[in-house]
């Protein structure tokens, strides 16, 4: 990969207090040959896209989207390894970091943001980092994705440790921000994984684990927010959900650590207890109240026939796994 020249950009990071912190960052602009990348090649099925009717457009898009799960199926062993590493990180008090730019970064932030309400975990447990910071979630930040230095700064700001897992995400597989983050993570001693939509990608080679999905050319040439973005989202779903399930955040297929932040979720919590135990709604509601709002504790109380205090002790001994807590002897 030949480097043509360097530029210095001034990036402004907006703090929670609304203050701006300026940073001059050197970025490398690459002379790239993108024509060999699957994500940049033209799709022969859509060469006449501009001549298609609305029904023809959505039909071909739907047919192309159907290829994504089949492509992901070829990467399941690698995705399962990422799930294992994430679960191990959580059990050691570590965290899961997603790193990406543009659409890839936004998808990481989106998946991370869903973990606290779904699994009742602190927002610091799964962190989405996007090149350029929060502003980049809604608009492009010039030069951000081309800076390895920014990635290192972002990870240092979160005090990265060897107990964490860093997952780099880039459809092209060559984003400098992601490469910089993976290299720094390896120097810290983290497990590292890469999600790309080109085989033999730079980030795949840089990471300890490569998850490379060949979804074929995009319907709209080079628009990786389409099939590539869909593939990335499905893989992130698997990593976050699988690792949370492995660490006791589900009983059967129920979200037993769901946070009750609105009326719909209060009702869902009651339904989860009913589904898990078979009790009537009034009894489920009473158990949740006695458990201080904890669905997991309420289920353990009802299935182990114990009070909230004992249920909490059982869950602590079982490291949060309801099934194991129910089987424990009376404390």
Which residues fall in each region the model found?
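Cofactor-/ligand-binding subdomain signature composed of acidic, glycine-rich
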Residues: 27-71, 75
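Glycine-centered, small-residue-biased loops immediately flanking beta-strands
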Residues: 94
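Glycine-rich phosphate-binding loops that contact phosphosugars or nucleotide phosphates
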Residues: 97-235, 241-247
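Short, amphipathic alpha-helical interaction segments embedded in low-complexity terminal/linker regions
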Residues: 243-331
